[in-house]
A protein has these predicted regions:
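Conserved phosphotransfer microenvironments
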Residues: 55-58
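STAS-like cytosolic regulatory interaction modules
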Residues: 1-52, 64-120
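Internal alpha/beta domain cores that form substrate/cofactor-binding pockets in large enzymes
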Residues: 61
Length: 120
């Protein structure tokens, strides 16, 4: 998997993913998720709109990031998730699934809602 874009936003860290050769290790994704988790932002948004499928390694990395962010009271939000990618991720289900939303605007709303819920 190739991370084609990353941006530190006011309330989140955005990663946009693109497919790479299937035999390549997921080092770029692992590094980018690690940086995103260390950003201190309340949410990490991962745009999956360019992906056609998800490798087992990528699914494990996303699940791991999801659990680590939850421990820090942060959130992994997957955006523009194609049905095949969702299926690849959920077949490795390791507890409650990460939040999946159709658009970046929905991701912003989800992040704001979580922030409001934590403030109460």
């Amino acid at each position: 998997m190739t991370v084609v874009y990353h941006e530190l936003l006011p309330d989140s860290y955005l990663l946009i993913l693109a497919p790479s050769r299937s035999d390549e290790p997921e080092a770029a994704l692992a590094h980018s998720l690690h940086c995103a988790q260390r950003s201190g932002k309340p949410a990490v948004w991962v745009d999956c709109g360019m992906l056609h499928s998800l490798s087992d390694e990528a699914a494990q990395l996303l699940w791991g990031a999801h659990h680590q962010l939850e421990e820090k009271h942060s959130q992994l939000v997957l955006v523009h998730v194609p049905e095949r990618v969702k299926k690849d991720l959920l077949k490795r289900e390791l507890g409650p699934a990460p939040c999946m939303v159709p658009t970046l605007l929905d991701a912003a709303r989800q992040t704001a809602q979580q922030r409001d819920d934590q403030a109460v």
